[in-house]
Amino acid sequence: MRILVLSLMYPLPTNVARGTFVSDNVELLTSIGHDVKVINPLPRMLKYQEARRSTLTGVAKSPKKFKHGEIEVFAPRFWGLPGHPYPSITIRSMKKIAKKVTAWLDGWQPEIIVCHTIWPVAELANRLAKQWQIPWLSVVHGHDFDVGLQDSNI
């Protein structure tokens, strides 16, 4: 099965501990014969902004395309403001990323999309799933419950 994995959290060349729970899932899927591609949208930010959270380490200078193990990863940038005061900015950014993802996949089309984390990656998953008329599902993690459900802006 062709599976597209979308996640805000995935190991980066300079932060291999970031999002290992997602890469473990991807490795398991490939080990049982699935064809998996990974999209890791990253927020546009300056190096000093990485200090806000350990999971942001390496984001500012991460390449747009890289390999983690045997998996090719596409890491397009999106616009978003801390605290999400204007989520429409991020939603518009995800619309542009959808076009970049389609171009990067170069004719490869998934049969399903697996989305790790909800905001804002679910916006991208939903848009791509509608475009290709395929199902998508979300794997919800702690931050989605602890923070995301309480955020009145998203």
For the regions a language model picked out, list residue spans one by one.
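Generic structural signal for helix capping and beta-alpha/helix-loop junctions
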Residues: 13, 46-48, 83, 122, ...
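A conserved catalytic-core segment of Leloir-type glycosyltransferases
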Residues: 38-108
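An aromatic- and histidine-rich active-site surface loop
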Residues: 87-98, 110-132
